[in-house]
């Protein structure tokens, strides 16, 4: 998953689903050490790659 994110989604705005009611959104800033870093509105979200169920390019960045 990490190599796919780096090669295909680096710099893209994505939505990330990890289960439950929450979907995380933001621009893919980095993906290293099995952690995905998203940036949105000057704040960062760090997501453990092994917790990701699905991710997709956001329709409305």
What does each of the following model-derived ranges do?
Residues 1-61:
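Conserved RNA-binding domains used in RNP assembly and mRNA/RNA metabolism
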């Amino acid at each position: 998953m990490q190599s796919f994110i780096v090669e295909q989604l680096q710099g893209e705005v994505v939505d990330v689903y990890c289960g439950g009611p929450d979907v995380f959104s933001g621009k893919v800033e980095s993906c290293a050490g099995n952690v995905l870093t998203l940036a949105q509105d000057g704040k960062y979200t760090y997501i453990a790659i092994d917790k990701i169920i699905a991710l997709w390019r956001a329709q409305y960045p």
